[in-house]
């Protein structure tokens, strides 16, 4: 609403991110998650995780309190990237068996996983963004070296599009098919950040604490993301918020860890599994920003 004719006031969760804290959530049923599982979900009360080490096919869903086992992936694998919602998700690529890159893609309809068209480039430790089984982006990763490849999914096939400016794996990703962000990754210096506008990647301001193998919110845009945890030199609890132009340090995870997975938005996110660096834990933490009043001056 307008106040005084020139001031716009709004009430929402985005303004509450700087004061939000992480809280303990329900434990996974299956340990051994990460590095990089297929995650999906839009908030702290809506999460999904599939795959994990060693070559797991398990899939679990989160309702804000507890995790429940649902139908497995057709192909067990680790280092897989995924995106979407509890009723419409995608899992692609990965490592199965250890050291063998895969290009297979599976779609989740809310009940079952179905195999579909393969990636053009088999790889692992990539990132993905998107909100359904018909609209996703898959970028970065590792073959026999770190790669910059980016592929776009239209619901039936993958198409090679413009590459990242910096080849990397163990990368954080958030957003949609047309508005995404690629965060950090290996190799050093582990602080690169790029945004995607639907046709090309642009380098933007770096994260404050250089690291890789962290988790990220998955749902949002190139202007709204959360990145947490990671390493080296040791597993960290650092959490940073991206507002579209700069990174801000916010409250840390309760337990520092790397090789963890993330889902949700920058204002309502889940941090799942991970370890310092092993064994992989069953921990879940919830980041839920309080609704707060924000003020913007308009001319």
Predicted regions: what is each one?
Residues 1-299:
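Polar, enzyme-active/binding microenvironments
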């Amino acid at each position: 609403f307008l106040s005084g004719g020139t001031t716009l006031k709004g009430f929402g969760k985005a303004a509450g991110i700087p004061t939000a804290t992480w809280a303990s959530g329900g434990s996974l049923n299956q340990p051994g998650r990460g590095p990089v599982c297929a995650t999906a979900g839009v908030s702290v009360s809506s999460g999904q995780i599939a795959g994990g080490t060693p070559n797991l096919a398990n899939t679990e869903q989160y309702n804000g309190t507890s995790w429940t086992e649902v139908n497995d992936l057709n192909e067990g694998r680790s280092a897989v990237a995924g995106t979407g919602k509890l009723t419409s998700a995608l899992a692609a690529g990965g490592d199965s068996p250890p050291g063998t890159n895969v290009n297979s893609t599976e779609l989740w309809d809310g009940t079952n996983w179905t195999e579909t068209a393969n990636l053009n480039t088999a790889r692992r430790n990539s990132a993905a963004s998107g909100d359904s089984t018909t609209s996703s982006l898959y970028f970065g990763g590792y073959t026999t070296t770190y790669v910059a490849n980016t592929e776009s999914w239209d619901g039936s096939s993958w198409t090679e599009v413009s590459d990242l400016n910096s080849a990397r794996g163990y990368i954080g990703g958030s957003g949609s098919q047309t508005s995404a962000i690629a965060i950090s990754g290996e190799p050093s210096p582990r602080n690169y950040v790029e945004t995607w506008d639907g046709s090309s990647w642009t380098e933007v301001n770096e994260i404050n604490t250089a690291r890789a193998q962290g988790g990220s919110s998955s749902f949002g845009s190139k202007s709204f993301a959360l990145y947490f945890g990671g390493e080296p030199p040791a597993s960290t609890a650092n959490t940073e918020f991206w507002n579209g132009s700069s990174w801000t340090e916010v409250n840390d995870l309760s337990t520092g860890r790397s090789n963890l997975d993330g889902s949700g938005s920058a204002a309502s996110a889940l941090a799942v599994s991970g370890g310092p660096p092993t064994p992989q834990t069953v921990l879940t933490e919830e980041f839920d920003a309080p609704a707060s009043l924000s003020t913007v001056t308009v001319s």
